[in-house]
């Protein structure tokens, strides 16, 4: 049985879905105004791995996995104004980049990818419900959620009132009845993207987007809601409040699962801090997506992950070792030890250590569950390389050695090494692989 750490309960609990034939999981996806950094990739990889585990345990068709795209946001609007283009140019560009980058890391597309701009009707309908129930109010063209109207507010983050106000993203506006109240709808100037609504032309607040899309595509109560630790407050806390009030007190999610940060030095990797490195940059440097995926899985998902060159180098060495051990075997059965590790709150470090004890088909099948060893060993060691050209240089080197021109032989070896090709001399001749 799968056991997951539930942020709400502050403990690991057995995962028993509401309906094993229709398991629902929603993960907060990208706000598409810039290139994703490797910290943004961590939840994509973590929840992709959890989705693989759920499908292994309950059946390939058992899970409906939704990951949204926030394509209306103040940062998107600012980027569009800077470039002098329509916001859709920004969002389409960076969504395309996001999907390319995550695909390179072996992240499968979600079953549903709702876009905020395509769900405005669902959002305004939810806001109208909250106004009608007395949980929201209109003020100066805005609609705000009344935090004091929800007696259970704070159940996820366990923050006291002063912490809530300090942790909110915005300064206290004069039109708020209470400093903790948050925006459901905000007015848009004529030149800014917006939609007609009962409260005038405007656009949705960040939090109501996810609540409305979850209800529309997955239902009022889902099995798992995921995201990064930084989303616990205010985003997920606010989602819980508005969904509960709109749906007669029903819980939004039965499990809240949050991944830890990727750190650069002593700080969390963050665009606002400017200490980011992107998958695109790492791929351009010659690292393979599978290497980056293994690096992201090397620490338990709830723990911080310090990102270093050594981490990536170790991940590459581990994959070299695993590909050699797997050979060209076809996948067989997944190893029980790997399964048990993943069932225990997605313990990927333990699962990876178990992989090191396997070989052949069992290794291949078990690694697939982690999204690893998706290539053949030949492709891993020699793929994307002009094999004929390398073999020609090896033949040239062999001829030089035959003629006892060892300086020429060493030069060829060094030139290939500089191109990332490692030669290995053995009794059966010379073989090669990429570094």
Regions found by a protein language model. Name each.
Residues 1-33, 44, 48, 57, ...:
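Alpha-helical recognition segments enriched in aromatics with Gly/Pro capping
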Residues 9, 18-106, 432:
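N-terminal, positively charged nucleic-acid-binding surface of large information/translation enzymes
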Residues 20, 109, 139-140, 425-429:
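Short Gly/Ser/Thr- and Asp/Glu-enriched loop/turn motifs at secondary-structure junctions
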Residues 61-64, 134-140, 422-424:
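Short, well-structured beta-strand/strand-turn elements
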Residues 69-72, 95-98, 108-123, 141-150:
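Short, glycine/charge-rich beta-strand/loop segments that flank catalytic centers
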Residues 81-87, 112-117, 228:
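The substrate-binding groove and active-site-proximal loops of carbohydrate-active enzymes
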Residues 268-435:
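Structural preference for alpha-helix termini/caps and helix-kink/transition segments
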């Amino acid at each position: 049985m799968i056991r997951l750490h539930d942020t709400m309960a502050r403990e690991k609990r057995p995962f028993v879905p509401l309906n094993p034939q229709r398991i629902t999981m929603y993960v907060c996806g990208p706000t598409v105004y810039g290139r994703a950094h490797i910290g943004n990739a961590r939840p994509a990889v973590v929840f992709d791995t959890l989705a693989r585990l759920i499908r292994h345990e309950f059946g390939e068709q058992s899970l409906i996995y939704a990951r949204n795209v926030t394509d209306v946001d103040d940062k998107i609007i600012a980027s569009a104004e800077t470039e002098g283009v329509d916001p859709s140019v920004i969002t389409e560009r960076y969504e395309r980049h996001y999907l390319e980058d995550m695909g390179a890391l072996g992240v499968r597309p979600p079953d549903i990818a709702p876009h905020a701009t395509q769900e405005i009707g669902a959002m305004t309908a939810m806001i109208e419900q909250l106004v009608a129930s007395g949980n929201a109010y209109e003020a100066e063209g805005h609609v705000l959620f009344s935090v004091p109207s929800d007696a259970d507010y704070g159940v996820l983050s366990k923050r006291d009132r002063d912490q809530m106000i300090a942790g909110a993203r915005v300064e206290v506006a004069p039109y708020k009845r209470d400093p903790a109240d948050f925006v459901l709808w905000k007015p848009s100037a004529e030149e800014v993207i917006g939609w007609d609504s009962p409260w005038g032309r405007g656009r949705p607040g960040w939090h109501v987007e996810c609540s409305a899309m979850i209800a529309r595509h997955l239902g009022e109560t889902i099995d798992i809601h995921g995201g990064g630790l930084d989303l616990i407050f205010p985003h997920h806390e606010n989602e819980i409040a508005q969904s509960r009030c709109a749906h007669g007190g029903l819980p939004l999610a039965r499990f809240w699962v949050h991944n830890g940060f990727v750190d650069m030095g002593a700080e969390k990797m963050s665009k606002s801090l400017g200490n980011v490195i992107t998958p695109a940059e790492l791929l351009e440097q010659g690292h393979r997506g599978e290497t980056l995926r293994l690096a992201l899985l090397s620490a338990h998902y709830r723990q911080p992950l310090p990102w270093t060159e050594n981490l990536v180098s170790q991940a590459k060495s581990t994959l070299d070792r695993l590909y050699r051990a797997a050979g060209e075997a076809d996948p067989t059965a997944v190893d029980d030890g790997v399964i048990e590790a993943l069932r225990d709150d997605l313990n990927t470090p333990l699962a990876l250590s178990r992989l090191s004890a396997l070989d052949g088909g069992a290794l291949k099948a078990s690694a697939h569950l982690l999204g690893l060893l998706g290539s053949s060993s030949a492709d891993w060691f020699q793929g994307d390389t002009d094999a004929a050209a390398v073999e020609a240089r090896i033949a040239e080197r062999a001829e030089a050695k035959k003629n006892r021109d060892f300086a020429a032989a060493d030069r060829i070896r060094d030139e290939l090494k500089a191109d990332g090709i490692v030669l290995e001399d053995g009794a059966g001749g010379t073989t090669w692989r990429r570094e």
